[in-house]
Amino acid sequence: GLGFRYEFPQQKNLNYFIIKEEDTEFDFPTDMKAWWMVADYDSQEYRYQETNISEIPARWDKAFDSNASQKLIKNAVQSPLMLKKNGKEPLYINIAEAAVLNYAASHLEVDAQNFKFKTHLTADRQGAKGYIQTPSVTPWRTIIVSPKAEDLMDSKMLFNLNEPTKYTDTSYIKPTKYMGVWWEMIIGKAQWAYSTADNVHLGITDFSKLTPNGKHAAN
């Protein structure tokens, strides 16, 4: 595989600037099979789809269920993206990113007719996709290739391209189970609000005197 990034060295007339767009493209010669998920600024919790690249736009509108937390990007897919070149010598290709620091996360816009993808950066409310002070670098754009899908998991590329931890002691980190309320919230079944009161003062309002709305996920 390979990884590449863009560097912005400090220069006399290049100290601060705003990223408007990144035009990195991943072009493929054939209509490969793709395992993909719709791109969303706010959520990564959708079902994976299995289609050819050319079929992504036709499937896109049917590839998600509406929920209460949704900022979709039309005809774009999430990163990482898995592809397969069929034929006598099959090839699996994974597109991802690493070391996303002080820079927007990346999605992939689909050009289905030409079998290619272009980076689509997550914007803020003003439409800016990065406030950069030089010297600076972008995240790594990565392509991992293998004739066997399971061998992609053995690649250490993403591990090596991310910065090592700055924590000196990680012995306290242990595997555990977590039970949260997110799934109930994104389908509109539950909410954070404890009551229907519309004027709550944190540290002042006596919640014991409020009437529960019955929709809080902990109820």
PLM regions and their residue ranges:
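N-terminal accessory beta-strand-rich subdomains and adjacent acidic, glycine-rich linkers
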Residues: 1-168
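An acidic-aromatic substrate-binding cleft motif
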Residues: 133-218
